[in-house]
Swiss-Prot record:
A zinc finger (CCHC-type) spans 389-406, 410-427. The active site is at D537 (for protease activity). Keywords: AIDS, Aspartyl protease, Capsid protein, DNA integration, DNA recombination, DNA-binding, DNA-directed DNA polymerase, Endonuclease, Eukaryotic host gene expression shutoff by virus, Eukaryotic host translation shutoff by virus, Host cell membrane, Host cytoplasm, Host endosome, Host gene expression shutoff by virus, Host membrane, Host nucleus, Host-virus interaction, Hydrolase, Lipid-binding, Lipoprotein, Magnesium, Membrane, Metal-binding, Multifunctional enzyme, Myristate, Nuclease, Nucleotidyltransferase, Phosphoprotein, Protease, Repeat, RNA-binding, RNA-directed DNA polymerase, Transferase, Viral genome integration, Viral nucleoprotein, Viral penetration into host nucleus, Viral release from host cell, Virion, Virion maturation, Virus entry into host cell, Zinc, Zinc-finger. A motif (Tryptophan repeat motif) lies at residues 1008-1024. The keyword RNA-binding applies. GO terms for molecular function: aspartic-type endopeptidase activity; DNA binding; DNA-directed DNA polymerase activity; exoribonuclease H activity; lipid binding; RNA stem-loop binding; RNA-directed DNA polymerase activity; RNA-DNA hybrid ribonuclease activity. Mg(2+) 1 binds at D721, D796, D797. Residues 838-846 are annotated as: RT 'primer grip'. The record marks G222, P223 as: Cis/trans isomerization of proline peptide bond. Mg(2+) 3 binds at D1234, D1286, E1322. Protease: The viral protease is inhibited by many synthetic protease inhibitors (PIs), such as amprenavir, atazanavir, indinavir, loprinavir, nelfinavir, ritonavir and saquinavir. Use of protease inhibitors in tritherapy regimens permit more ambitious therapeutic strategies. Reverse transcriptase/ribonuclease H: RT can be inhibited either by nucleoside RT inhibitors (NRTIs) or by non nucleoside RT inhibitors (NNRTIs). A lipid is attached at G2 (N-myristoyl glycine). This is Gag-Pol polyprotein.
């Protein structure tokens, strides 16, 4: 831990653990808080070593002081922790955090006199007085100077991003905080955002695009005069290739100033707006009020989504006035329309305050009861009925205003306003006509902005800042967007049905009226000129309305409705006007609860019930780069299989699933046939293994199967299956050619017929992913249109559950079947399950319960490994609902490397376990469905065989059960196993229910907390509450962390000879006692354990034991309670007897009293190699050069454990973990170069990409001349063919280009604002600075220390490929390249020779073969695809002149040419 372990020592640690986190709280400080604080200091550029002293803590408090009032919770916690550590160093006694802060405040005021008051972390501080503006560039004495952004501004920006999560508030917040900033300041703000790297990458891409556009629009001018300021490029505006001074000059120069800061701000705003849309995907058109949602909650969601919309204020104003009312639920909409034109938001909220509440429900119920209890009308007695008299003065029934005794009301008795009487009241008018412009006629869409219709508000009549034509165009564009949204996803009514095919093909241009069925489709119709609100009902045969008079030309008729039989009047040829369309139809009038237009009028109007869905388009699939399709020949098949395949292929060809392959198709895959389960039909299979190898990779979209315990309880369930699922989805045309296969014929009587797939083939690896993706798209509109219906789809199995009535549920299922059938998916009736029990995914489902389908365990006389594997699989499947299932001893039957067909010998324990499982399976178990409103609980139990079982339940109803028997270690601890059980249950619950259950665990709180304090880094554990159950898990023994004073100390050791397997184990004490035991057939680990057991046996109730074995220390520190090893069980029993025990580990033995003596005691005649004398030179080497582990191990022959310990004890090397060395794929001559800065000096760095070799030195100026000199110096030492740099001015200068041209070096540049393009040298800059920090004290000047650090990195760091240093690797690469070139030149001479040869005793000459290599005694010959080694005496080498030569022609044999033209 480096500096962290030395922050507090001895008594200070004890004092720390007594301080409470909060006054009066139970939790106290632990060492883990110190470790956390040390990690957090790095974020503020503070060293961890400052925590080791009082003065250092005071420096930290000084830095954190101004940040606390506006800081995050983490910052405040860090400040509090540092205050506590300061008090411990100052030996001040504190009880809690608040007391520590008060003490620190008092001391700092007394010592410095400047700390007037410590910041309070418990409440926010008031903002400081003064100007609050943010102006990084200020004019002082006529000159512009740059003032860096304050930490408070940066902290406000970070806090804004973290709290709002890129909500709509981030854009105006950025605009306010970045006002007047330069690109340097804006980049500083972006770099402060640590998380949200996806959003940062989006912003970087926008910056790159905008910078490229800027460069295109502003080309580079000609040569500039000396001293004149250059024009900014795109990378200059982004701040990557320009300085702050240049940015200020561009912004504030007298002639043609360029506001680079504002330009860069605009680029960032574009990126932020894109991020806002990504993080807030909800469209404003989709924000609708739920049936029971309060209006205030709906308004909050509406305005939150409105802020994320990036549009002009006029469109937002229209959205507010139109969509807010349009998307309200029917109850609120009715109230809002009564408020008149353009009500304020305050009026809307006030009016809709009680909607949906108990009061409104009571009023509606009273009105319904009043209508239901009203006396039935007497036939032909309408003339005798009298209208109820209502008083206009007091509003009561039973008397007129003349008879009213109440005081006379002033003003109008209708509206209450003065200035007119009730007869002239404008609100008494029917209001059918409007006195404002109607605008364009549009359809009555419940969700569309429309100036006419019963459910819309018109355009506001007050003047607008924009012309009316622009507002109308914006509204029309919004209408088109909304129409596309509705047509793409909602189930609705469309009328009229003209141009239906055009609409489904994707032409969204015509505005057919549509009605989303999220509420009742109600329109205003005119029956013989009389307005009436009617419901469009596709389930009604006739049309009936109430409240209108159509004369006496009618015929009486009795019709049956929802409320019983109704007496009506039937009128024929009545003129009806709906949606600006007139028809003549038959209509009835009568006492109906709601006015209905049935199918007779809907058909005449051309209306239809539609379910628009997206067209199933094939997904493009390609082969892997450089790969070609399969070309595998068809193997022979029996006549029976050929006939079956022929019949199957002809059927598939008729159905459009196959088509005949053209003769130019070169690809082929073997096909064969197997019998189906019923043994009567055949199934065609294609061996797509070769095609799968060359096809691109896919991702499984559905990662697991759904579980019935995660289903909500519903009254109706239906299960259906998609027949030939894969064959219903088209395969991309470009990929079909690779699926070609051939049907052979018997005796090759005729050419085989070749087919290719037009649909997804079975057995191809892309079919599951494409099918899952397509089904999600197909079912998405159905899910949106039926939010109350549960639709679970896994591959071709679909489950539909709802609480609807039987008729409505069956109608919904029918709609889904029609949807699937319309897209080409078949839903076979034999797999359609309407009544329980439903067979689904291996389960049996009932409306109120679920259980597993019948489980039959196999009965066999002879069991193989494969049989046992299948048996265990069946039992594990049953364990999800049958508690107590065990497979421990069954799994032990097949331990080790065994073949699948190998016979298994049963043990008594396994037979007993199987019989016990059979008894459990004979008792049927049932599971329940999930109820979200109830609490989810998990109860854990442990049986005698160390197997954990658990059940997840809600009250007494069990959802599912499970078991856990994984024991990863030989020596186990009950609390650790319990943590793994909790982890498994937590992950399982998150997957199935999306929430963590409340745990009932058999462990005491003290036991858990004692273990968790030491092992809290173990892994992810869900949050859980302790519930008291009988404790089964206990910690068996008490290990202390500090040596026990006054008790005997045992030094133990063991050793073993690997050849003879003989060993010794023993101990020696600080009081002179020792003991050695000779062991046979042992190992080093067993000898170490034996020595530890001897020390435990011979020690008293309290003891200190020192071991040098990490194996022993790991077992003891894990506090095992049981083990499979008899020796470890003996150690556990002895440790339980101890009152207290201290165990420590020390590396090696040298210089440690007692440990060195016992090592010599047990090593005589056993150990053969000692490396202790090399540890001190290795330590000196590391202190000097800070070499890594591999270098120390290689140079001094130390074990890696010892070398790693040397590195771990070095404070300078522990600020970062050990690097993972490697090598990128690069050419030999490729180098990267960059400039970095340290202590005010400029360091130019060049890195050889392939080896990691580094050249670096300090240069006086970052100019092109100095860079060119360094490049020339580098090129004179090493071979360079390619140099990669960034776009810095020194690297793009003419001097560098001239040197690169002269030396023949190809130069390339990185991408602006993307340092990953030169990632090797960027990383090496970081490593170089770390190395300099380690050896900084060994030299005075920066020039010297840079060269020393380069030497250490090139010659003292071993690792990567070949375990070589960078210098060795570079020299080896250059040498290898030269050898390859030499061998290539030598081998090129052999290309024009051919070899005839004889093999074995065969006297016939074979060949010719290609000569690959000629040695002194043999030659290497390539014949076809075979490579042969032939003795020289059996080979004849001739030169190939292109024509045929005789073998025996002596003029062409080896050695006969005078000019030496031989190999």
């Amino acid at each position: 831990m480096g500096a962290r372990s030395s922050v507090l020592r001895g008594k200070k640690v004890d004092e720390l653990e007594k301080i409470r986190l909060r006054p009066g709280g139970k939790k106290k400080y632990r060492l883990k808080h110190i470790v956390w604080a040390a990690n957090e200091l790095g974020k503020f550029g503070l060293a961890e070593s400052l925590l080791e002293s009082k003065e250092g803590c005071q420096k930290i408090i000084t830095v954190l002081d101004p940040l606390v009032p506006t800081g995050s919770e983490n910052l405040k916690s860090l400040f509090n922790t540092v205050c506590v550590i300061w008090c411990l160093h100052a030996e001040e006694k504190v009880k809690d955090t608040e007391g520590a802060k008060q003490i620190v405040q008092r001391h700092l005021v007394a010592e410095t006199g400047t700390a007037d008051k410590m910041p309070s972390t418990s409440r926010p501080a008031a903002p400081p007085s003064g100007r609050g503006g943010n102006y990084p560039v200020q004019q002082i004495a006529g000159n512009y100077s740059h003032v860096p952004l304050s930490p408070r501004t940066l902290n406000a920006w970070v806090k804004l991003v973290e709290e709002k999560k890129f909500g709509a508030e981030v854009v105006p917040g950025f605009q306010a905080l970045s006002e007047g900033c330069t690109p340097y300041d804006i980049n500083q703000m972006l770099n402060c955002v640590g998380d949200h790297q996806a959003a940062m990458q989006i912003i970087r891409e926008i910056i790159n695009e905008e910078a490229a556009d800027w460069d295109v629009q502003h080309p580079i001018p000609g040569p500039l005069p000396a001293g004149q300021l250059r024009e900014p490029r795109g990378s200059d505006i982004a701040g990557t290739t320009s300085t702050v001074e240049e940015q200020i000059q561009w912004m504030f120069r007298a002639q043609n100033p360029i506001p680079v800061g504002n330009i860069y701000r605009r680029w960032i705003q574009i990126g932020l707006q894109k991020c806002v849309r990504m993080y807030n995907p909800t469209n404003i058109l989709d924000v609708k009020q739920g049936p029971k949602e309060p209006f205030q909650s709906y308004v909050d969601r509406f305005y939150k989504s409105l802020r994320a919309e990036q549009t002009d204020p006029a469109v937002k104003n229209w959205m507010t006035q139109t969509l807010l009312v349009q998307n309200a639920n029917p109850d609120c909409k009715l109230v809002l329309k009564g408020l008149g034109m353009n009500p304020t938001l305050e009026e809307m909220l006030t009016a809709c305050q009680g909607i949906g509440g108990p009061g409104q429900k009571a009023r509606l119920m009273a009105e319904a009861l009043k209508e239901a209890l009203a006396p039935a009308p007497i036939p032909f007695a309408a003339a005798q009925q009298r209208r109820t008299i209502k008083c206009w003065n007091c509003g009561k029934d039973g008397h007129s205003a003349r008879q009213c005794r109440a005081p006379r009301r002033q003003g109008c008795w209708k509206c209450g306003k003065s200035g007119h009487v009730m007869a002239n009241c404008p609100e008494r008018q029917a209001g059918f006509l409007r006195d404002w412009p109607m605008g364009k006629e549009a359809s009555q869409l419940p969700r569309d902005p429309s100036p006419a219709g019963a459910d819309t508000n018109s355009t506001p009549s007050r003047p607008s800042s924009r012309p009316a034509r622009e507002v109308l165009a914006a509204r029309e564009e919004a209408e088109r967007a909304e129409n596309e949204t509705i047509q793409g996803g909602d189930r609705g009514l469309t009328a009229p049905r003209t141009r239906r095919d055009t609409t489904q093909r994707g032409d969204r241009g015509f505005a057919a009226p549509q009605f989303s069925l999220w509420k009742r489709p109600v329109v205003t119709a005119y029956v013989e000129g009389q307005p009436v609100e009617v419901l469009l009902d596709t389930g009604a045969d006739d049309s009936i309305v109430a409240g209108i008079e159509l004369g006496s030309n009618y015929s009486p008729k009795i019709v049956g409705g929802i409320g019983g039989f109704i007496n009506t009047k039937e009128y024929k040829n009545v003129e009806i006007k709906v949606l600006n369309k007139k028809v003549k139809a038959t209509i009835m009038t009568g006492d109906t609860p709601i006015n209905i237009f049935g199918r007779n009028i809907l058909t005449a109007l051309g209306m239809s019930l539609n379910l628009p869905v997206a067209k199933v388009d094939p997904i493009k699939v390609i082969l892997k780069p450089g790969k070609d399709g399969p070309k595998v020949r068809q193997w022979p098949l029996t006549k029976e299989k050929i006939e079956a395949l022929k019949e199957i292929c002809e059927k598939m060809e008729r159905e459009g699933q196959l088509e005949e392959a053209p003769p130019t198709n070169p690809y082929n895959t073997p096909t064969f046939a197997i019998k189906k389960k019923d043994k009567n039909k055949w199934r065609m299979l294609i061996d797509f293994r070769e095609l799968n190898k060359v096809t691109q990779e896919f991702t499984e979209i559905q990662l697991g199967i759904p579980h019935p315990a995660g289903l909500a309880k519903k009254r109706r369930i239906t299960v259906l299956d998609i027949g030939d699922a894969y064959f219903s989805i088209p395969l991309h045309e470009d990929f079909r050619q690779y699926t070609a296969f051939t049907l052979p014929t018997v005796n090759n009587a005729e050419p085989g017929k070749r087919y290719i797939y037009k649909v997804l083939p079975q057995g191809w690896k892309g079919s599951p992913a494409i099918f899952q993706h397509t089904m999600r798209q197909v079912l998405e509109p159905f899910r949106k249109a039926n939010p109350d219906v549960i639709l679970v789809q896994y591959m071709d199995d679909i489950l539909i559950a709802s609480d609807r009535t039987d008729l409505e549920h069956d109608r919904t299922v029918l709609q889904l079947k029609e949807l699937l059938n319309g897209l080409g998916f078949s839903t076979p009736d034999e797999k359609f399950q309407k009544d329980p029990p439903y067979k689904w995914m291996g389960y049996e489902l009932w409306p109120t319960k679920w259980k597993l389908q019948k489980i039959q365990l196999p009965q066999k006389e002879v069991w193989t490994v494969n049989d046992i594997q299948k048996l265990v699989g069946v039992l594990n499947w049953a364990a999800q609902i049958y508690p107590g299932i065990k497979t421990k001893h069954l799994c032990r039957l097949i331990r080790g490397k065994m073949t699948l067909t190998e016979e298994v010998q049963w043990t008594e324990l396994a037979e007993a376990e199987l019989e016990e499982n059979k008894i459990i399976l004979s008792q049927e178990q049932e599971g329940c469905y999930y109820q979200e409103e109830k609490e989810l609980e998990a109860t854990v139990q442990k049986d005698q065989d160390n197997q954990w079982t658990y059940k997840i339940h809600q009250g007494e109803k069990i959802l599912k059960v499970g078991k856990y028997a994984k024991i990863k270690n030989t020596h186990t601890n009950g609390v650790r196993l319990l943590a793994h059980v909790v982890q498994k249950i937590g992950k399982e619950a998150l997957v199935i229910w999306g929430r963590i259950p409340k745990f009932h665990l058999p462990v005491e709180r003290e036991t858990w907390e004692q273990w968790w304090d030491n092992y809290w880094q173990v892994t992810w554990i869900p949050d859980w509450d302790f519930v008291s159950t009988p404790p089964l898990v206990r910690l068996a023994f008490n290990l202390v962390k500090d040596p026990i004073p006054g008790e005997e100390t045992f030094y133990t050791d063991g050793s073993c000879n690997r050849q003879s397997k003989e060993g010794k184990a023993g101990y020696i004490t600080d009081r002179g006692r020792d003991k050695v035991r000779i062991l046979e057939q042992t190992t080093n680990q067993q000898a170490e354990l034996e020595a530890f057991a001897m020390a435990l046996t011979d020690s008293g109730p309290k003891a200190n034991i020192i071991v040098d074995s990490q194996y022993v220390m790991g077992i003891v520190a894990g506090q095992p309670t049981e083990s499979e090893s008899k020796l470890v069980n003996q150690i556990i029993e002895e440790m339980i007897k101890k009152e207290t025990l201290y165990v420590a580990w020390v590396p090696a033995h040298k210089g440690i009293g007692g440990n060195q003596e016992v090592d010599h005691l047990v090593s005589q005649g056993i150990r053969q190699v000692l490396f202790l004398e090399k540890i001190e030179p290795a330590q000196e080497e590391h202190e000097k050069y800070h070499s890594n582990v591999k270098e120390l191990s290689h140079k001094f022959g130390l074990p890696k454990l010892v070398a790693r310990q040397i590195v771990n004890t070095c404070a300078q090397c522990q600020q970062k973990g050990e690097a993972i060395h490697g090598q990128v794929d690069a050419e030999l001559g490729t180098w990267q170069m960059d400039c970095t800065h340290l202590e005010g000096k400029i360091i130019i760095v060049a890195v050889h990409v392939a080896s990691g070799f580094i050249e670096a030195e300090v240069i006086p100026q970052e100019t092109g001349r100095q860079t060119a000199l360094f490049l020339l110096k580098l090129a004179s030492r090493w071979p360079i063919t390619h140099l990669h740099t960034d776009n810095g001015a020194n690297f793009t200068s003419q001097e560098v280009k001239m040197v690169a041209w002269w030396t023949g070096i190809e130069q390339s540049f990185g991408v602006p604002y993307n340092p990953q393009s030169q990632g090797v040298v960027e990383a090496m800059n970081h490593h170089l600075k770390n190395q300099i920090s380690r050896i900084r004290e060994q030299a005075n000047t920066m020039e010297t220390i840079v060269l020393m650090a380069v030497h250490c990195m090139n010659f003292k760091r071993r690792g990567g490929i070949g375990d070589m240093t960078p210098a060795e690797r570079l020299i080896n690469m250059i040498t290898t390249e030269q050898e390859i070139q030499f061998l290539h030149a030598k081998n090129s001479k052999l290309k024009n020779f051919r070899v005839y040869f004889r093999e074995g005793r065969d006297q016939l000459w074979k060949g010719p073969g290609e000569l690959l290599w000629k040695g002194d005694g043999a030659v290497i010959v390539k014949v076809g695809t075979d490579i042969k080694i032939v003795p020289r005496r059996k080979a004849k080498i001739i030169r190939d002149y292109g024509g045929r030569r005789e073998v025996d022609s002596s003029s062409h044999l080896e050695g006969t040419r005078e000019d030496g033209e031989v190999a």
